[in-house]
Amino acid sequence: MMNEEPTIDRKRNDDPMTSALTRASAVTRRAVLTGIAATGATALGACTSSAQLTDIRGDYSGEIKFDSYDTSAGTYEPATRKHRAKNTPKPVKPANIDNKTVAGIYSALGHYAAAITYAINTGEDTCIQQVNMEEAGKKGVYEYFGKPFTKAWVGESKCVFILKDPLPTKKDDTYTWPCTTKITIGEFAVSDGRARDISSDKREITDDAEMHLTYKDNKWVISTDALFFSSATSGTNKV
């Protein structure tokens, strides 16, 4: 029926929209959004120290703000029940993203969240491919956040990271930043020509997590664990 809410049922994968929302919910387990350490990396110890990096703000806590976009495609048209979003602005790397500074980490994470947002709203992997992350990680992120929306779409959606601490901490070569990840899903979902409303109490997905980054080859790299996707599906669905 036109107003039927999407049912999140892990046992049913025949409906592209159900599959898409299931995946979007499941991946809020901390690995996909935050990159829990690279495969084989040494686990973080209990002893950490403040980041030994240059910074100009001192306190970066709160929702990461990101405003670096390419809007050359034309006037943006949000998704409707009749068509998916058109001319969606593409996130581009800020000028300081590769700087070995706290601001550089901040920009790298903001770019990552914006790339996930773009994937959800378009079903494309274009921007995820630009994220500073190992190829296996980028492929996994797209499988969860973009691919399900190649045949279905939702109302305008957004992924953000909310930093809990003023600054990241450092252990060996890894910088860690605790955060809350939040995905806000649009008011409706469309698949196979059918539009269905999503109730307001099922449109926000949040999870507490940690972000791990290392500075390699003159850029910040967001770490990923190649095994997290199988465990991520055990998360609680909230959409």
Regions found by a protein language model. Name each.
Residues M1-V27, G35-L44:
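N-terminal secretory signal peptides
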Residues T150-K170:
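A short, amphipathic edge element
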Residues M17-R23, A51-D67, K170-V239:
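Exposed beta-sheet edge and beta->alpha loop/turn motif
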Residues R23, I36, A41, C47-G104:
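Juxtamembrane and targeting peptides
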